[in-house]
Amino acid sequence: MEFQSDLTREISPQRKLGRGKIEIKRIENTTNRQVTFCKRRNGLLKKAYELSVLCDAEVALIVFSSRGRLYEYANNSVKATIERYKKACSDSSNTGSIAEANAQYYQQEASKLRAQIGNLQNQNRNFLGESLAALNLRDLRNLEQKIEKGISKIRAKKNELLFAEIEYMQKREIDLHNNNQYLRAKIAETERSQQMNLMPGSSSYDLVPPQQSFDARNYLQVNGLQTNNHYPRQDQPPLQLV
């Protein structure tokens, strides 16, 4: 315990506060600057290597010292990585230019559409007899011709629909008339049947029309008004139905 307390007393106040932040600025001393460069360069190369291995990334590192000495690192090839970088920058610039061109094109098309919409709105107002102050005599004549042409087309279509409606109503009237006649005939037939059924002593023979009779021997109809000179006299009297 005494050794531990003595060790605690020997720790300086700076050690207790921990490592402070180092101010980032140019090192004026040449020797110190060179030493720092070597240390930081090695650390940077180590970090680049670790990044390429851990993350499977293509890394290229180029460093020039203050004296112009070159230091480089690449897990593949510095030249190949630089070419890939140039291509990526070119593609991104082309993509930006294409996007800009597309945006400009769509803006122009939108302007054209807005102009067309404005013209159509003005024409509609002119057809309604509004906003005529900006039209000259020629424009007014053209507008009048267009309106008259449109009115003639509207009238022709209206007459076509009216004629079709009249034709349909006429056919409908004929159908209704035929149905009415058929129903009247059915009603009259039903009334006659009911009257015949209500008559007393009615039988199947009552259905025979008047002024006609039946010859019981041969069931031939004989006119009651005709004489019997045309028929041979029968010796036997005719049968009578009871």
Curated annotation (Swiss-Prot):
Q: Gene3D superfamilies from the entry?
A: Transcription factor, MADS-box
Q: What is its main location?
A: nucleus
Q: Which PROSITE patterns match?
A: K_BOX (PS51297), MADS_BOX_1 (PS00350), MADS_BOX_2 (PS50066)
Q: Which CDD domains match?
A: MADS_MEF2_like
Where in the cell is the protein located? Answer: Nucleus
Listed PANTHER family: SERUM RESPONSE FACTOR HOMOLOG (PTHR48019)
**Which function does this protein serve?**
Probable transcription factor involved in regulating genes that determines stamen and carpel development in wild-type flowers.
Can you say what this protein is called?
Answer: Floral homeotic protein AGAMOUS
- Protein source organism: Petunia hybrida (Petunia)
Q: What is the taxonomic lineage of the source species? A: Eukaryota, Viridiplantae, Streptophyta, Embryophyta, Tracheophyta
| Gene designation | AG1
